[in-house]
């Protein structure tokens, strides 16, 4: 992943949720765990919370987190930008 500033990150879609939690220093992943369904990756999580397939450039708001689908490869989300609202 890349950290652009204190609130903005770029992740690969295949990033494991547990690695995502560590990267953003999330102490309690309960909020994400309650909504992740069967997903284990960031891309899978976005599919779960949108209940569909987001388009490139689509913005998905989840509590104080804003995800933007930045890229696809072979119909898979491969890049996600995250902004954490303070």
Regions picked out by a protein language model, each given a short descriptive name:
Residues 1-86:
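Cytosolic regulatory modules rich in charged/polar residues
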């Amino acid at each position: 992943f890349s950290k652009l500033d204190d609130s903005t990150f770029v992740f690969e879609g295949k990033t494991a949720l547990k690695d995502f939690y560590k990267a953003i220093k999330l102490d309690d992943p309960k909020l994400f765990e309650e909504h992740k369904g069967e997903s284990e990756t960031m891309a899978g999580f976005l599919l779960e919370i949108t209940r569909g397939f987001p388009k490139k450039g689509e913005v998905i708001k989840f509590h104080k987190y804003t995800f933007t689908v930045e890229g696809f490869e072979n119909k898979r989300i491969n890049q996600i930008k995250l902004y954490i609202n303070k």
